[in-house]
Regions:
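Beta-loop-alpha module in the N-terminal Rossmann-like domain of NAD(P)-dependent dehydrogenases
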Residues: 52-100
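N-terminal Rossmann-like dinucleotide-binding module
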Residues: 1-49
């Protein structure tokens, strides 16, 4: 099983990614959206850490990497608007995750 993080959790594409992550037996560890989209996440991953601020999300991913508790992020699923993709790809690379 792999650990995922997701950006743009409240967007149009995110439910497809959430379903695929769940259907393949993987875990969503953290999610980001500037709007409160917990209702969408709860139906798939009720224990997922949810953030509305990018800085807090980024800090959380860094902490997961340093703690070495088996919760490091393997994949960052980017469902945010196109203009944010560059920053989110760089975040994925910095924490050792593959960007989707």
């Amino acid at each position: 099983m792999k650990n995922f993080a997701l950006t743009g959790a409240g967007g149009y594409v995110a439910p497809r990614h959430l379903k695929a992550i769940k259907d393949t037996g993987n875990h969503l560890i953290a999610a980001l959206d500037k709007h409160d989209s917990v209702g969408i996440l709860d139906s798939y991953f009720p224990d997922c850490a949810f953030f509305t601020e990018y800085e807090r999300f980024d800090r959380h991913l860094e902490k997961l990497l340093r703690r070495d508790e088996g919760k490091e992020i393997h994949y960052l699923s980017i469902c945010a608007p196109n203009y944010l993709h560059d920053a989110h790809i760089r975040t994925a690379l910095r924490v050792g995750a593959d960007a989707l």
